[in-house]
């Protein structure tokens, strides 16, 4: 069956997840024009599809995304994580339970190297730790690859899902994935709204829209001082036929 003929997944809300989506705050000016409301902590396990994704690309794994893996138990999983402190847990956890490949490098807009800030036991960032003033963290140099230099369309089983959570580096990951986006059926990206040194949310939309993606859902959000600082946006291509 050709890729075009494969059934395309459609992301739906579970009734319970829908009830949990009580409106608390409107999005700030960066995304208010989209006319969306903010979800109040709905995890990735609330995603449903008619057929299930066959390939999941988890970029910025850290300790893993178990709710996402559990939702699609038959999917092949590609794990992308440059921070070595997370490898033992991944190798004794999800990699023993599932069909996975661990890619021990960062993803970005160009191939090369970058400085990774190890911001504690649960976080790492290529953008530094400006949001943690007065604190210092160890740094290491890690390799960086473009996603579309690592995987080709022919390497993916369809439907395929791309999830990105890279602590403010999401735009660069998408810029390095453009040649692969035609083979991706849905994208979940953590979008940051309050980091002046990161990107504008509109830039995420500008990359995905030309490839036919539309914003269809908003999952878990982070709110600080009654302002949304980041949220998980779900994009997919409209169903046809």
Per-range role (PLM):
Residues 2-241:
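Phosphate/nucleotide-binding beta-alpha loop and adjacent structural elements of enzyme active sites
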């Amino acid at each position: 069956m050709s890729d075009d003929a494969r059934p395309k997944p459609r992301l739906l809300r579970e009734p319970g997840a829908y009830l949990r989506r009580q409106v608390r705050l409107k999005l700030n000016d960066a995304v208010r024009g989209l006319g969306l409301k903010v979800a109040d902590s709905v995890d990735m396990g609330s995603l449903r599809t008619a057929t299930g994704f066959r390939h999941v690309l988890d970029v910025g794994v850290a300790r893993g995304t178990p709710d996402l893996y559990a939702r699609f138990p038959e999917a092949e999983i590609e794990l992308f994580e440059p921070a070595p402190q997370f490898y033992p847990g991944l190798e004794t956890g999800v990699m023993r339970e599932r069909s996975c490949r661990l890619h021990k490098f960062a993803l970005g807009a160009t191939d090369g190297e970058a400085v990774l800030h190890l911001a504690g036991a649960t976080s790492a960032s290529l953008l530094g730790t400006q949001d943690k003033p007065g604190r210092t963290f160890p740094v290491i140099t890690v390799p960086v690859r473009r996603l579309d230099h690592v995987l080709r369309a022919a390497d993916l089983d369809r439907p395929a899902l791309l999830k990105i959570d890279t602590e403010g580096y999401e735009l660069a990951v998408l810029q390095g994935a453009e040649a692969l986006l035609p083979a991706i059926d849905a994208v979940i990206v953590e979008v940051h709204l309050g980091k002046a040194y990161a990107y504008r949310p509109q830039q995420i939309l500008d990359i995905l829209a030309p490839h036919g993606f539309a914003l269809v859902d908003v999952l878990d959000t982070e709110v600080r001082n009654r302002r949304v600082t980041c949220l998980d946006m779900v994009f997919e291509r409209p169903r046809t036929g």
